[in-house]
Amino acid sequence: MHEAASGKAYPEVPFRIDHGRVAAFREVFDQAEGVPTTYVTAAEFTVIPDIVTDPELGIDFSRVLHGSQEYEYRRPLREGEDLTIKSRIESIRSMGANAFLVLVTELVEPGGDVVCTARSTLIERAPDRSG
């Protein structure tokens, strides 16, 4: 993973809080109403393919582990609303032979207000040197 990619922002992507997807999340979490707090993960998975295939980042996804996940809500998500996903690499740091990437994904209203911020830590393990 290339530490020089730290700070890189990715193209904005439109994202609808889709009733069908929300219903599936509610079913899994046995939630009767509202948008589950972890629904933001669906937004992250919309942009993750572009990030892990970015040659400028140079990540080897076969060695990636999910390290942590945080959500910060300014208000609840609403079914049917159209938001924009803004993603950026907040930081990349090495610890020993491993690399830690912090990805920040924001869901933003048309007026520019941030509704929710997700922060994910991905860990790229060192290459296996046994073989």
Report each predicted region and the residues it spans:
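Hot-dog-fold acyl-thioester-processing enzymes
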Residues: 1-68
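Residue-level signal for functionally critical sites in structured catalytic/ligand-binding pockets
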Residues: 18-24, 66-72, 94-97, 120-124
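Mid-chain, well-packed structural core segment of small domains
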Residues: 60-86
